Amino acid sequence: MPPPRLSLFDLQVNGFAGVDFQRESLPAADLRAAVTALRAHETHRILLTLISDEPDALCRKFAHIERLRKADALIAETVCGYHLEGPFLSAEDGYRGAHPAAVQRAPDLSLFQRMQDAAGGLIRLVTLAPEWPGSADFIGEVTRSGVVASLGHTNASESEIDAAIHAGATLCTHLGNGVPQMLPRHDNIVQRLLARDELTACLIPDGVHLPPFVLRNLFRAKPPGKVLLTTDAMSAAAAPPGRYTLGAIDVESRDGAVRQPGHANLAGSCLTPDRGVENAARWLGLADHEARALFSTRAAAHFGITLPVLDPA
């Protein structure tokens, strides 16, 4: 008898089905439509992701979305926490990706606590660049409070990565992305992070963020159990090609990629989680249940999240 088919879980969702979660005063109907669309793609649990912005704006967004979450049982069930990606990222071009340089700053525990309070204590994942001063202390404090710390949008040295791991960092966000188009041949951030078996790598299986052969190489290089899959989806996911927003950024979804017009860097993805499972199974040579585990139980276990069984119908 086959194992029960569980919901997928995505730890990095910036928007979906034409809805941009970065929008201030996001309408309740839009958020409900987005989570309904996610569930149609077999994804009943997500970490809703907010990206870099001014601290006051992030606090307002968290407080507003948390009010919507509390007021709607379907939203509350689907949005089981938040992922904060910025403003504690690298300000260097290339490493910051589409995140604005002007708002990046050293990790600040009091600022994080303000955002955590606004989010009702549900920020469960924070992505940061550990080269900022005070990063190790910050990681130690937030991980002791139950928040998972992930390294991303970073050009940290080996010693800075080592300090972050010893402080409690356990993930790396969209490994192979959030980096410049050109890197040194050997000593680069992808290799530095990949070399650390303590870190679980989050990978985006859309064929754009990582070509299939790169996805295979990264998957093979990590120890068993040290890879998770995510979409980094934004509002263009489960929506037609065209113009969309990612917060204050205007982007274009075309040919399976989302970019700022005139820029080479990616700005999230238009991948849906169920398509990500199909891609992973095909490109990594996995059985369906093995690919689903990377997008469900294995990821959810990092956050103590129990996934529901999908209705066979």
Where are these regions (language model features)?
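Metal-dependent catalytic neighborhoods of phosphoester/phosphodiester hydrolases
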Residues: 56-67, 95
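Active-site-adjacent C-terminal substructures of enzyme catalytic domains
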Residues: 138, 160-292, 302-306
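Residue-level marker for buried hydrophobic side chains located in beta-strands
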Residues: 7-9, 82, 150, 227-230
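Catalytic metal-binding/acid-base residues of hydrolase active sites
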Residues: 14, 89, 154-155, 207, ...
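Divalent metal-dependent hydrolysis catalytic cores, especially in the metallo-beta-lactamase
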Residues: 13-20, 32-61, 77-90, 119-131, ...
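Short helix-capping segments at alpha-helix termini
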Residues: 70-77, 119-121, 144-146, 222-223, ...
